[in-house]
């Protein structure tokens, strides 16, 4: 399963760990992904989404129906 938020499009970023001595080692910054079921009243069913914590806040603000239409407009089947 890919580590990509379906709402915001956030994906892992790469960077460096920096020690006190300024040694650098490569690392990945992973998004805060959660799997969450949302009740969609218009479809009378649950929809299971893998999204970041920021994606959940966007759904709280805009509503699940509005976000689902945006996702489906991008060609993702839900």
UniProtKB/Swiss-Prot annotation:
One of its GO terms (biological process) is translation. The keyword Protein biosynthesis does not apply. PANTHER family: 39S RIBOSOMAL PROTEIN L28, MITOCHONDRIAL, LARGE RIBOSOMAL SUBUNIT PROTEIN BL28M. GO terms for molecular function: structural constituent of ribosome. It comes from Pseudoalteromonas atlantica (strain T6c / ATCC BAA-1087). One of its GO terms (cellular component) is cytosolic large ribosomal subunit. Keywords: Ribonucleoprotein, Ribosomal protein. The keyword Ribonucleoprotein applies. The gene is rpmB. This is Large ribosomal subunit protein bL28. Pfam families: Ribosomal_L28. Belongs to the bacterial ribosomal protein bL28 family.
